[in-house]
């Protein structure tokens, strides 16, 4: 079974579109997402464009603020402070990566917790690990949604996550734990990685290396979630972290690249923006 994140995201966006259409009558306005883009990295520009298109489709107001990569850290932090204080702004996202002279940790921590639509703020991360109500990181949230829609039973399953980043690896491991999977986190220093991955009933791969996971590393009937977005060094085409053509016949469930996890990440960003907006309305 192939899980199409593209198809699922369209369904979810249609539901959100209907929900947002009721907001002007209920609350006097629609949610407002501000995206800050520093520099002209082609990948970042593409992601920001995708977020703007999704916002427009759902009916969320989207403002993209473009800054040159020469902007100072202090100037960027001042801009974030201004957006934090702006009551018309519900969500703030700073597109990563940032230029080397700017601390990503400082920038993430500067965003108001209640406007952190990425779920990266230290207080949101702490709340996730404490099982408290919080904004969930978009990609891990999307992965769990895809597993559930595909009818995958997570409880009691052996799940292996390759990758330990704060953006995907660690939070998706926690969400799988919360669904009562038995989770192993593997990484670049894991000894005999194939023996670890072959034990996985659910395998999540998020390392950013094209076709790194080969068919002999995957058990027959495994569920394979490919988070990677890379260029195939041979063809130049987009590919994931797993060798899709070789693994798809073995897997019971698999996500393609493109059209798998990627669309769900942007869709969950829309969900998080609505969530931040509604929380503000409930407090007001």
What would you call each of these model-derived segments?
Residues 75-87:
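Short, well-structured alpha-helical segments in soluble
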Residues 55-69, 183-185:
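Short beta-strand elements in bilobed, periplasmic/extracellular small-molecule ligand-binding domains
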Residues 31-39:
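Short beta-strand segments enriched in small/hydrophobic residues
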Residues 38-52, 134-223, 227, 232, ...:
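Glycine-rich phosphate/diphosphate-binding loop of Rossmann-like nucleotide-binding domains
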Residues 95-101, 209-211, 230-232, 260-263:
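Short glycine-rich anion-binding loops that position phosphate/pyrophosphate groups of nucleotides
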Residues 105-121, 125, 228-281:
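Rossmann-fold NAD(P)-binding glycine/threonine-rich loop
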Residues 94-154:
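Anion-binding alpha/beta catalytic cores of soluble intermediary-metabolism enzymes, centered on
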């Amino acid at each position: 079974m192939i899980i199409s994140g593209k198809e699922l995201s369209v369904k979810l966006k249609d539901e959100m579109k209907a929900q947002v259409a009721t907001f002007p009558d209920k609350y006097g306005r629609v949610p407002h997402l501000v995206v800050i883009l520093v520099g002209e990295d082609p990948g970042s520009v593409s992601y920001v464009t995708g977020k703007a298109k999704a916002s427009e489709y759902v009916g969320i107001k989207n403002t993209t603020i473009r800054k040159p990569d020469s902007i100072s850290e202090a100037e960027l932090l001042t801009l974030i402070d201004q957006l934090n204080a702006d009551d018309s702004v519900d969500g703030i996202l700073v597109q990563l990566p940032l230029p080397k002279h700017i601390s990503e940790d400082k920038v993430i921590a500067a965003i108001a917790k209640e406007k952190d639509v990425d779920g990266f703020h230290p207080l949101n991360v702490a709340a996730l690990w404490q099982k408290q109500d919080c904004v969930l990181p978009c990609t891990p949230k999307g992965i769990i949604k895809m597993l559930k829609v595909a009818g995958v039973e997570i409880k009691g399953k052996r799940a292996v996550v390759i990758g330990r980043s704060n953006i995907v690896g660690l939070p998706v491991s926690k969400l799988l734990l919360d669904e009562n999977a038995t989770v192993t986190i593997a990484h670049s220093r894991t000894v005999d990685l194939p023996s670890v991955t072959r034990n996985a009933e659910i395998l999540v791969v998020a390392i950013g290396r094209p076709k790194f996971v080969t068919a002999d590393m995957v058990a027959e009937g495994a569920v394979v979630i490919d988070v990677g977005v890379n260029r195939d060094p041979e063809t130049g085409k987009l590919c994931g972290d797993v060798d899709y053509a070789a693994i798809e016949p073995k897997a019971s469930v698999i996500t393609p690249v493109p059209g798998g996890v990627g669309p769900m990440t942007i869709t969950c960003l829309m969900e998080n923006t609505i969530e931040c907006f509604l929380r503000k309305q409930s407090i007001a």
